[in-house]
Amino acid sequence: MLTTCPRVWIVDDDTDDQYLFEIAFKRLVPPVEIKLLDDGEELIPALMQTSDLPNLIILDLNMPRLNGFETLKQLRQTPPYQHVPVIVLTTSSHREDQEKAARLGANGFLTKPPSMDLLLVLFGQLVQDWELS
């Protein structure tokens, strides 16, 4: 059972998307702790500096320095972060991107802009998982 509030990290270079997800999580999963990162390059160093791993990472695929695919690959190869759930986020609806993300270990895939209904369903499932863990 989750004894503290969920920790969600949003890795996206688009501040509008960061804001959308931050607001959605705060409305749907209160209380929640949000951490915003602007690029995949920042993720592993930020994880190394915390003792409280996130319960979920929302990861954009299209970022300027280190894209989401490479970030996800690094994450899945770096203990103890291999098992942190990751939902990838992209403007691309290409099946190849979804398949590649799944092969690299993504737990879910959202196309931008995600509908609020889809966010409700996804976040509701995550809250149930958090409450059971």
Where is each model-derived feature located?
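Receiver (REC) domain active-site loop signature in two-component systems and cognate sites
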Residues: 63
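His-Asp phosphorelay/catalytic-motif detector in bacterial-type signaling
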Residues: 5, 52-56, 80-85
